[in-house]
Design a protein with these regions (language model features):
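Glycine-rich phosphate-binding P-loop
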Residues: 36-51
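Amphipathic coiled-coil/heptad-repeat helices and related helical stalk/stem segments
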Residues: 50, 97-101, 162
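NTP-binding/hydrolysis catalytic cores, primarily Walker-type P-loop NTPases
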Residues: 227-271
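Short amphipathic alpha-helical segment that frequently serves as the phosphate-/nucleotide-binding helix
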Residues: 47-52, 163-167
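Nucleotide-state-sensitive switch-loop elements of NTP-binding domains
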Residues: 26-36, 59, 63-124
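Extreme N-terminal, non-catalytic leader segments
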Residues: 1-36, 103
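Conserved catalytic-core segment of NTP-binding enzymes
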Residues: 123-227
């Protein structure tokens, strides 16, 4: 069984404070949630999405078990400040270890807290197949848990592949899921589909009933924003750690606070 991590330390003054919205404290959103990052292509910021979610939970004093289920690249687990637990649900033949996955689902429905689960590209197909074949989303819903799938889209050459991934995931889950689309323009450029934004696409129109919300990671014209973000990602630092560090220059701290605020405010509005 997966055990809950210890409650996070009280947030420090460097962290942007976000108050819960009305939507977060009423109706469906009051139930425990299982957040999973999914995308069939590697290197498209899945771990970044999980990382930001975990930081948001920590900053707002909400409790979540943060799990890294990527069998090959334990990116999220490298963030020591986030109390990430590495879980191994794959066998040597790259198939799901059903017993371990059963235990994971059991933890989702018995532990009284949210979960954040980061998945990799290599376990994408077996992971999806298990969830669908075992009606995992319905099981979670029947036990008062929401399954929230976080799907990143990035610009540039990877846009079409990530759009295909989004369509495949949305199609695989007919009911009992909510989808959060991360439009990460900071990673590989502006997300534009034949001159149209994502909200004007056929993919969005087909699946908007399942979409809980969009989180846009904006592209900043000043390359210094990108450099500051790359620094904390390469050093596996949270926003709070970097902002509090005496090694971080004053204007870098200001840019990091701005990026943190942009992301956290959108997470607050969505989840």
């Amino acid at each position: 069984m997966v055990q809950s991590p210890p409650p996070p330390a009280p947030p420090d003054s460097s962290v942007v404070k976000v108050s819960p919205t009305t939507a977060q404290t009423s109706g469906d959103r009051a139930r425990f949630a299982v957040h999973m990052t999914l995308q069939h292509k590697g290197g498209v910021t899945k771990s970044f999405c999980a990382n930001c979610l975990a930081q948001y939970y920590q900053a707002t004093g909400r409790v979540a078990s943060v799990l890294d289920a990527d069998p090959t690249n334990k990116t999220l687990a490298a963030y020591k400040a986030l109390n990430v637990r590495s879980v191994d649900i794959m066998k040597d033949d790259n198939n799901i270890d059903t017993r371990k996955f059963d235990d994971l689902i059991e933890a989702f429905v018995t532990e009284d807290n949210d979960f954040i689960v980061d998945n990799g590209a290599t376990n994408f197909l077996p992971f999806i197949s298990y969830l669908v074949a075992n009606s995992a989303a319905s099981i979670l819903a029947d036990n008062g848990r929401r399954l929230v799938l976080h799907i990143p889209l990035v610009g540039g050459e990877a846009l079409n592949e990530t759009m295909v991934g989004f369509d495949d995931i949305a199609k695989a889950f007919a009911t009992d899921v909510q989808i959060v689309v991360w439009l990460n323009e900071a990673a590989k450029g502006v997300i534009s589909l034949n001159g149209k934004n994502f909200e004007e696409s056929r993919s969005y129109e087909r699946n908007k009933g399942k979409i809980l919300g969009l989180i846009r990671v904006p592209y900043h014209t000043s390359e210094l924003f990108g450099q500051d973000m790359e620094t904390i990602l390469s050093k596996k630092l949270t926003f709070a750690q970097a902002i509090e560090s005496p090694d971080t220059r004053l204007m870098s701290k200001q840019r990091l606070k701005q990026m943190q605020r942009e992301i956290f405010e959108q997470i607050s509005a969505v989840i």
